[in-house]
């Protein structure tokens, strides 16, 4: 249980900062983009029974599920990073890991995940464009990495 607390806290912080960016200055919010993509992928024959079962709130359930999915994915990535950090602490290589983790997470989101969600590379297809997407995800990834690498060690 102790191994999951710091990565889970980092994931919650990253998701909360992302939401703050969305509502404060209109930055991108991955769970929102994922829910939009999810609804475009569901065929009409499958969507009708889902809508009957869950009613009007079905889009909110999907949105909540996407938030939980993002937190879970960031927690799993964080647990893997923390394991690697614990192995490298003896050699003193953990100090540079913050920058490596932050840049890797930001690059994965901006170059890998956003294009899959039809947002373009670095959020070019979003209303705010890359001028909002890049700073938002750099701050999110930097905060996430800082909590992961500065949190209590095992």
What is each PLM-predicted segment?
Residues 28-55:
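Extracytosolic (periplasmic/ER-lumenal) interhelical loops and adjacent juxtamembrane/interface segments
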Residues 23, 27, 82, 86-87, ...:
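Transmembrane helix-loop junctions in multipass membrane proteins, especially transporters and channels
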Residues 1, 85-95, 152-154:
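Membrane-interfacial, low-structure loops and terminal tails that flank and connect transmembrane helices
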